[in-house]
Amino acid sequence: MTGIWDVRITDTSLRDGSHHKRHQFIKEEVGAIVAALDAAGVPVIEVTHGDGLGGSSFNYGFSKTPEQELIKLAAQTAKEAKIAFLMLPGVGTKEDIKEAQDNGGSICRIATHCTEADVSIQHFGLARELGLETVGFLMMAHTIAPEKLAAQARIMADAGCQCVYVVDSAGALVLDGVADRVAALVAELGEDAQVGFHGHENLGLGVANSVEAVRAGAKQIDGSVRRFGAGAGNAPVEALIGVFDKIGVKTGIDFFDIADAAEDVVRPAMPAECLLDRNALIMGYSGVYSSFLKHAVRQSERYGVPAHQLLHRAGQRKLIGGQEDQLIDIALEIKREQESGQVASRR
């Protein structure tokens, strides 16, 4: 399939969607989804726990099915698509990378907070030694200026990363904010590495932001069929393909086949639709890491406080991925205010 696209699409519904499903995928679902996406022409399918290799834990949530078994199943099922896996240094290990490759994964996507690219250096080195394709994720990209993001991308590229992504983890970037960051990375990296974009729908701009990214020079774009991802979900792949078809951007994915996959295969595996509701909007507006949604809902139910207030305060505190446990502190703070008669502020 190489060479039939202007932009390469990675479907992340079996990784980012794991957040929405509370990491409860079973083999039958993964096999069916991989087969449908592969048949539609999706070139890359990401499969892992929502928080990457090794993410199954008390802090992030336990997987129903071991992720390495799902990676192996996906690789055995796909006829054309490559299987990607995500790892976060400090969550996953180098041994996890080796095992994922042994199970058929061929693209290693390494994610760090957008100011901490240096922690990925040894992992990129290992991935390249193993012959894996490498992708870097600079998460929460809305929190730093384009030129600073580009400097972090340079660290990843020099370490062996072949494509660095601007990752809008909170769905907080708006159009020009995406274009400016992608353009800054393109200018910095030149021919040394490609640039990608990973969006969320928390302000309803996942598709529009992806178009802006491509126009600014991005060569790889993430999405999830049926928006199956954290928060309000990712840019829906079926919509991305429809839009890219209309503006003349080749993806190699058949629009009708991917629309069928979204409706007939992916939707039945989802616990519910990914909604652009108040909680999701608050995350986009306040700049909250999208995977906080389910954690906030759980603490809301546990302590009897509004989830949207938890999320807004998480944004005020500038919490990042890995700090989900601080939602408990925020919930207790709001609970004390309620009991003392104070009205929790939205601002």
Curated annotation (Swiss-Prot):
Reactions this protein catalyses: (S)-4-hydroxy-2-oxopentanoate = acetaldehyde + pyruvate
InterPro entries, per database record: 2-IPM_HCS-like, 4OH_2_O-val_aldolase, Aldolase_TIM, DmpG_comm, DRE_TIM_HOA, PYR_CT
Keyword vocabulary terms for this entry: Aromatic hydrocarbons catabolism, Lyase, Manganese, Metal-binding
Feature type site, description Transition state stabilizer: 15
EC number: 4.1.3.39
Domain of life: Bacteria
Binding-site residues for Mn(2+), renumbered to this chain: 16, 198, 200
SUPFAM superfamilies named in the record: Aldolase, post-HMGL domain-like
Span of domain Pyruvate carboxyltransferase: 7-259
GO molecular function: 2-isopropylmalate synthase activity; 4-hydroxy-2-oxovalerate aldolase activity; manganese ion binding
Family: Belongs to the 4-hydroxy-2-oxovalerate aldolase family.
HAMAP family xrefs: HOA (MF_01656)
Protein name: 4-hydroxy-2-oxovalerate aldolase 2
UniProt organism field: Mycobacterium marinum (strain ATCC BAA-535 / M)
